[in-house]
A protein has these predicted regions:
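Canonical Rossmann dinucleotide-binding motif of NAD(H)/NADP(H)-dependent dehydrogenases/reductases
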Residues: 4-41
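Active-site loop of short-chain dehydrogenase/reductase
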Residues: 14, 63, 92-93, 139-153, ...
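Catalytic Tyr-X3-Lys loop
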Residues: 110-129, 148, 172
Length: 253
């Protein structure tokens, strides 16, 4: 069981689970949460990349508790077991950061491949459904829990070639807002004991992308380090203030 060390901020000693921890956004988030003093439990379907991400966060912040678990988030039972195992080992869960991503698109609406929808439904919707259902109770028990989804501005202003992606992102947002309403109702007059919120970007950029395309401007893109900073900052605000909110990291369309 983990207890707060009485450190400098709300994340000191907090237990945060990160789904999709092995990608660039996941790596940056592991780093930032470890820096803030959190116990970080990352999951991913790629064990090799997950191990690299966990090792990097541990190395950057010596003494930080950062662990990784290979979890199939398309399996609800596995996802529930991950949540139960994490709460049993560390005594509570104060956050679930959902960073599972993927993209498929086409040149025009007419060329949309419905196979892309099938894939994106699994990656962008089903994993959100499973993590939210698996972690909801533990986040409320925390008293300061957060469920954070990263989404794209395109969900609010879809383009013809992005039909499947935008629709999947919009569905994931709706699901997360429904979770937020559940938190609101269960909190009653005292306000929600946990919050579900959505961080919205145009797109993400990281150092490797810049190295591969040195002349690209990536206008309006959010660096994964900026996203990680915004994620950590959500715990600085009261649950009632952020619950059910879209937190825009790019201009709202």
């Amino acid at each position: 069981m983990v207890t707060s060390t009485g450190g400098q901020g709300p994340l000191e000693g907090a237990v945060i689970a990160v789904a999709g921890a092995a990608g660039p956004a996941g790596r940056a988030t592991l780093m930032r949460l470890a820096e803030a003093g959190a116990v970080v439990v990352g999951s991913d379907s790629n064990p090799e990349r997950l191990a690299e991400a966990v090792d990097a966060a541990r190395y950057a912040h010596g003494g930080a508790t950062v662990i990784g678990e290979t979890v199939d988030l398309l399996d609800l039972d596995q996802t529930r077991e991950w949540a139960a195992r994490t709460e049993k080992e560390f005594g509570r869960i104060d956050g679930l950061v959902h960073l599972v991503g993927g993209w498929r698109g086409s040149s025009t609406f007419a060329e949309t491949d419905l196979g892309d929808w099938d894939l994106l439904h699994k990656l962008l919707i089903r994993t959100v459904q499973h993590t939210s259902l698996a972690f909801q109770d533990a986040l409320e028990r925390s008293g300061n829990g957060r469920y954070l989804l990263t989404s794209a501005a395109g969900a609010s202003k879809p383009t013809g070639g992005n039909a499947a992606y935008a629709a999947a992102k919009a569905a994931a947002e709706a699901w997360t807002l429904a979770m937020a309403d559940g938190f609101r109702k269960s909190g009653g007059e005292q306000g929600p004991r946990a919050a579900a919120a959505i961080l919205i970007v145009k797109a993400l950029v990281h150092d490797q992308m810049r190295a591969e395309r040195p002349n690209a401007k990536f206008a309006g893109f959010t660096d994964v380090k900026e996203l990680a900073e915004a994620i950590a900052g959500v715990w600085d605000r009261p649950a009632q203030e952020v619950n059910g909110q879209r937190l825009w990291l790019t201009p709202e369309p």
